[in-house]
Amino acid sequence: MASLRKSHPLLKIANDALVDLPAPSNISVWWNFGSLLGLCLITQILTGLFLAMHYTSDIATAFTSVAHICRDVNYGWLIRNIHANGASFFFICIYLHIGRGLYYGSFLYKETWNVGVILLLLVMMTAFVGYVLPWGQMSFWGATVITNLLSAVPYVGNTLVQWIWGGFSVDNATLTRFFAFHFLFPFVIAAATVIHLIFLHETGSNNPTGLNSDSDKVPFHPYFSYKDLLGFAALLIALAALALFSPNLLGDPDNFTPANPLVTPPHIKPEWYFLFAYAILRSIPNKLGGVLALLFSILILMLVPILHTSKQRSLMFRPFSQFLFWSLVADVMILTWIGGMPVEHPFVIIGQVASFLYFFLFLVMIPVTGWLENKILGWQ
């Protein structure tokens, strides 16, 4: 008789995903970030749930309710610090996960990849509306600036912005609906994650060589279940260290000042994980052009499978393409730095060059280099 985990309708699904799943024997630590993202999502949902129990989404009390959570609620300070810094770790894991996918050619699983890009957009939207909730200065002005970008949409732009605001400015209606969205989206993300995994398990995991690994599989449990647990421990220790020792390291001091529509902060900027996209937005001196560049800076990931020209899947044996990949990583870091700088010389020109290079690498350099490597190897 088959064991219960193989015959029970529900346990069978868990078994096929977590126990008896055939996994390539050579997947490295770069394959840990998927499970770490799952851990981040669970952590954020749980801490967020407890924060929502004490938070009030009204402009008169939102800021003070967050102060109340930190001062009067049992371990409220800890829950808030884990939630705020958990978002940073979420994005660190996302960017490393995407980088892994780009480096090893995982994007050739097109359905899995495209659902992943949709997940990235959902997480970015969730983080944006969440940042508005404490109703500090940067919350308010960040919401004003980013929602205003929609006014660049031809013909319907202004109507669209007022519709999202629920009035003629960022006000109580805006905060209330942003809280509703921030509560809803993580569950949408959880559902999309299930779809992401369904598509992944259709094909199985890629591996560092990019070659077919059917001849060398190992069961997920115990090998990768324990490897994932080690990753969990590392992530939780790092998150606890940041949340306990320097919880405000990545935050903006302006957000300790309650929102004031009459005083604009000297430098409006988003959280660090959006700075690269913000730099691309600012590098184009035209509103609609900037908005399109901002959008395309993320959606360009969907074009990567189409622009893949190499006969090899992974970059493991492609030194020229490796150089371009690390150039892209350096470029994103430069954009992140520029996004946090004031709009003045030399930061403007550095941002424009880095933004051009970002798109040039994706759209021209990487495809041409892939084709060139085929030629060099005589693989016409």
Curated annotation (Swiss-Prot):
Residue intervals passing through the bilayer: 33-53, 77-98, 113-133, 178-198, 226-246, 288-308, 320-340, 347-367
Record's keyword terms, sorted: Electron transport, Heme, Iron, Membrane, Metal-binding, Mitochondrion, Mitochondrion inner membrane, Respiratory chain, Transmembrane, Transmembrane helix, Transport, Ubiquinone
Residues binding heme b b566: H97, H196
Gene Ontology biological-process annotations: mitochondrial electron transport, ubiquinol to cytochrome c
InterPro entries in UniProt: Cyt_b/b6_C, Cyt_b/b6_C_sf, Cyt_b/b6_N, Cytb/b6-like_sf, Cytochrome_b, Cytochrome_b_C_euk/bac, Cytochrome_b_N_euk/bac, Di-haem_cyt_TM
SUPFAM superfamilies (UniProt xref): a domain/subunit of cytochrome bc1 complex (Ubiquinol-cytochrome c reductase), Transmembrane di-heme cytochromes
One MF term in the entry's GO annotations: metal ion binding
Pfam family, one: Cytochrome_B
Details of cofactor binding: Binds 2 heme b groups non-covalently.
Binding positions for heme b b562 per the UniProt entry: H83, H182
Membrane association type: Multi-pass membrane protein
The protein's assembly and partners: The cytochrome bc1 complex contains 3 respiratory subunits (MT-CYB, CYC1 and UQCRFS1), 2 core proteins (UQCRC1 and UQCRC2) and probably 6 low-molecular weight proteins.
Note, other: Heme 1 (or BL or b562) is low-potential and absorbs at about 562 nm, and heme 2 (or BH or b566) is high-potential and absorbs at about 566 nm.
PANTHER family to which the protein is assigned, alphabetical: CYTOCHROME B
Biological role: Component of the ubiquinol-cytochrome c reductase complex (complex III or cytochrome b-c1 complex) that is part of the mitochondrial respiratory chain. The b-c1 complex mediates electron transfer from ubiquinol to cytochrome c. Contributes to the generation of a proton gradient across the mitochondrial membrane that is then used for ATP synthesis.
Identification of the protein by name: Cytochrome b
Organism: Paralichthys olivaceus (Bastard halibut)
